[in-house]
Amino acid sequence: MDRLKYDIVVLGAGESGVGAALLAQAKGLHVFVSDYGKIAPKYKEELNRYAIPYEEGRHTEAIILEAKEIIKSPGIPDTAPIIRQAVAKEIGIVSEIEFAGRYTDAFMVCITGSNGKTTTTMWLYHTLCKAGLDVGLAGNVGFSLARQVAYDPHPYYVIELSSFQLDNMYDFRANVAILLNITPDHLDRYDHRFELYAEAKMRITRNQQPEDCFIYWEDDPFISRWVAEHPPVARLLPFAMEARTDNTTAWINEKNELVVMNLNSPFVMDEELLALSGMHNRHNAMATAIAAKAMDIKNEAIREALQDFKNVPHRLEKIARVKGVDYINDSKATNVNSTWYALESMKTRVILILGGTDKGNDYTDIENLVLSKVDGLIFLGIDNEKLHKFFDGKISRIADACSMHEAVSLAYKMASKGDTVLLSPACASFDLFQNYEDRGDQFRKEVLNL
């Protein structure tokens, strides 16, 4: 049985899990990787190349439950039987980010929130690179932090963090923590209790020191209340659409300029010059600018980066104009609030493609925008009953689709010249697609084939 005892067992063999295994091995730890599903060929080849033992299609309890510590991939819920058994045996369970943080003294800039995480992460990464910093991109984007710490270390990292990653972080410290917003999402993973999900997001301030910064959206009532009731140790640098208090660090003034104050020299920029439009992107730009200013990046570099950034794929990505109709891919909108921001930014009549795997959604939040802007709804999913129950009778044209080909064909028939066909599903993608990227890629392919 001794041969089955490992220092580290990694559950999940995606980028996060394989990166953790590589770092564990590099640090001289005896590591084993277990994936209940199929391991992608590129990761299997990598594990073989580094002679890291692994299994797929099962979780062997005799091995896993003898580990000194388990590194859990964020996609594995706490309700998984193997996790419950590990907890019962009091085996420590951490995230890949937590594990990687033990082996680096790099400056960590961490971004979380229900919406805007990827855009802000990429925008800030772009800004720091433009300023000449040697910076790594990690978390939900780029290569895993563990892989980079092992084989491509940087003095700075910009890290996108989900609530699932924050759940299993205990000693990790964010030098700059950014919380963009908190709206109901992934409630199926949090016993359908918003407060549990919100508490996970607030963990980003854990272990911060007085010299660190906490950047947050001051207009969010939950965040503001939480900050008042549980004052973080770090310096507070809030942003808002208007200057709410003397402490407000960034806002949009009456001249429609983005203003950053209270950080060495003031920063002012016409919001029309921002690379991305829409209210949500003003928030993302303010958070980016505050973080850059807090890191002593020069105004010129910040201004350039805010102006020439290219948005991430699958986030309000314009695919094509076909016979006077614009087709926009917002497949990354996996919750209702993301779809709200997408609809808010639309300047034309909309044919909206909604649906997928519901995560405890409340469609009341987008009802007014749908009623005022949407001329047709297409429900793309295996089970559209909840969508029909909410929207039937409110929008005259509603259709169901069980494939992206069918959804785009229906949208093409519904749309009139000057309209926008918007894929902004407000749901996860796992009923019909591998992930939101696959969903967006299929949308792009179907549109370009029209």
From Swiss-Prot:
It holds the Pfam family Mur_ligase_M. ATP binds at residues 113-119. One of its GO terms (cellular component) is cytoplasm. InterPro entries: Mur-like_cat_sf, Mur_ligase_C, Mur_ligase_C_dom_sf, Mur_ligase_cen, MurD. GO terms for molecular function: ATP binding; UDP-N-acetylmuramoylalanine-D-glutamate ligase activity. It is found in: Cytoplasm. Its main location: cytoplasm. Keywords: ATP-binding, Cell cycle, Cell division, Cell shape, Cell wall biogenesis/degradation, Cytoplasm, Ligase, Nucleotide-binding, Peptidoglycan synthesis. SUPFAM superfamilies: MurCD N-terminal domain (SSF51984), MurD-like peptide ligases, catalytic domain (SSF53623), MurD-like peptide ligases, peptide-binding domain (SSF53244). GO terms for biological process: cell division; cell wall organization; peptidoglycan biosynthetic process; regulation of cell shape. Pathway: Cell wall biogenesis; peptidoglycan biosynthesis. Its EC number is 6.3.2.9. Belongs to the MurCDEF family. This is UDP-N-acetylmuramoylalanine--D-glutamate ligase. It comes from Porphyromonas gingivalis (strain ATCC BAA-308 / W83). The lineage of its organism: Bacteria, Pseudomonadati, Bacteroidota, Bacteroidia, Bacteroidales.
